[in-house]
Regions:
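A cross-family "folded-core" feature that marks the main globular domain of proteins
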Residues: 1-493
Length: 493
């Protein structure tokens, strides 16, 4: 990462990853120690991020507690990462060479990015450092890619295109090609008797486009081109592939049967291998074990999951592990942030899933490497009619006690229910308590798992939280942490 982003931006990326790791407040010392920078630099980074991305990011500060990052409504932290990617010389060079924008211009990169020959050489060296494990390199003299495995190269280029933007948000110049990609995918689904998930279909569209671009440049899967796809004679497939247009020249990308056949061979291989994994016993068994472990911990039935969709996602992971066992993302971390969002909003579900990954059979233990991506799948595939269960499971029984009047007790109840939603079940309250009328024999005190009060009359109990008459954000944060800890402790072993 440090080779792709400059030193300051790389540190700012780690700062964002750390701050959104969970919803805990973090002290300046903890953050600076973790990032290995001084507190002055940390404050400068926070100031830079919240100023540069003021429409996206907010930083809150509480004395004696620390900092907390929040994303403004209607925005995503991904927007910052996408901005870095789209302004990165690393990605810009790879993109321009891929689309052959420099094909007829030796000075293209100097004139486009106003860089020196030394800078270009250094950046090419960085690119080759990252591409080496894929069997790829960028020739400095020709500024074109050398590729050992064209299938791997197309997977890389597809992933790179996805990393530059939202999977669903295509560049305006490629919108028509996106439509053609979806048409072709549907034809391939029918031919291979396979149905992709919605997310996989959107991802596949990028692989289709990148394959078309590579075939148009005559970078073929097979040097002799003797193998013919069974779909090359399909009129519909042929016409759709002829429709892909180069947005710069407005001419067709593919102009020959050889080029069309090459792209179809790539897609045939993709679909055949994907179908093998979709229908494999391994994908089925892994899905069943994972779902059963989670269902047991959530104290529910395995039928709450859409098994068919999960099998497809695990099948896709098996395909990727076999055909592209390399880094999928260099800067963007969609799966990570989506997983963190689930952790913050649905901590019990998150913990149940993570514990289940850690307890998988030895042969399946490697699947935990894909936990962030599958966390999102498992959440999406929990059937909608049962979502209420995710939020309400393991509610903590809370009793409120105050020395003030009944109105204050009701106000506290309102504040807690508003702040903690489904995390607690308030079973009752008492008011105007004194050392003379407070009784630990109150049956509700016995039933309660947590007692929140503004006095010490029940200090012999090990389940109290003492608050001030006016409850501040710091105390609400502490109560929230206590609730999450208690709810997680209730998970089935």
């Amino acid at each position: 990462m440090k080779h792709i982003l400059n030193k300051d931006t790389e540190r700012q990326q780690r700062l964002i990853m750390l701050m959104f790791k969970d919803d805990k407040w973090k002290s300046a010392k903890y953050i600076s120690d973790t990032l290995e920078c001084n507190i002055k630099t940390l404050r400068q980074d926070i100031e830079y991020l919240t100023t540069t991305y003021e429409d996206i990011l907010v930083c809150e500060y509480l004395k004696n507690i620390g900092y907390k990052f929040l994303v403004k409504p209607g925005h995503s932290i991904q927007e910052i990462f996408l901005d870095w990617i789209n302004h990165s010389l690393f990605f810009s060079i790879i993109t321009d060479v891929f689309y052959q924008k420099n094909k007829d211009d030796e000075d293209y990169f100097y004139n486009t990015y106003f860089i020196s020959e030394t800078t270009l050489k250094r950046q090419v060296a960085v690119i080759n450092y990252h591409l080496k494990e894929l069997g790829m390199s960028l020739s400095l003299s020709k500024m074109s890619f050398k590729v050992q495995d064209e299938f791997v190269a197309r997977m890389f280029f597809g992933n790179r295109e996805m990393e530059k933007r939202s999977i669903y948000d295509w560049d305006d110049s490629q919108i028509e090609n996106q439509g053609y990609a979806f048409q072709l995918i549907e034809l391939l689904e029918d031919f291979h008797q396979i149905k992709l998930t919605a997310l996989q279909k959107n991802m596949m569209a990028y692989f289709v486009l990148c394959s078309v671009v590579r075939s148009s440049g005559e970078f073929y899967l097979e040097e002799d081109n003797t193998i013919e796809s069974p779909l090359v004679t399909d009129k519909n497939c042929y016409e759709v592939l002829l429709s892909f247009k180069n947005p710069i020249s407005c001419s067709s990308y593919l102009t020959s049967k050889i080029q069309i056949n090459d792209t179809l061979l790539f897609l045939d291989t993709f679909f055949i291998k994907l179908k093998e994994n979709y229908t494999s016993d391994l994908a089925e068994n892994m899905s069943e074990e994972l779902m059963q472990r989670i269902a047991d911990k959530m104290q529910t039935d395995v039928s709450v999951f859409d098994k068919e969709l999960l099998v497809k996602d695990i099948g896709y992971i098996l395909f990727v592990r076999d055909k592209y066992p390399y880094k999928m993302s260099y800067i963007n971390h969609r799966g990570y942030f989506n997983s963190v969002a689930i952790q913050i909003k649905y901590p019990i579900f998150y913990q149940a899933v993570m514990d289940s990954f850690n307890q998988l059979s030895k042969d399946y233990a490697w699947l935990a490497h894909y936990a962030p991506e599958l966390m999102n799948s498992l959440f999406r595939y929990w059937k909608a009619q049962d979502y209420g269960y995710i939020t309400k499971i393991n509610q903590v029984k809370v009793f409120i006690s105050t020395t003030l009047n009944e109105n204050q007790a009701k106000l506290n109840q309102y504040i807690f229910e508003k702040a903690f939603k489904n995390k607690m079940n308030i079973i009752g309250y008492e008011y105007e308590q004194t050392s003379f009328n407070s009784e630990t024999t109150n049956p509700l005190l016995e039933e309660a798992e947590l007692v929140i009060c503004n006095h010490l009359f029940y200090q012999e109990l090990d389940k109290i939280i003492v608050v001030d008459d006016i409850i501040d954000d710091a105390k609400l944060y502490f109560i929230n942490q206590r609730l999450d800890k208690m709810r997680k402790a209730k998970l089935s072993v």
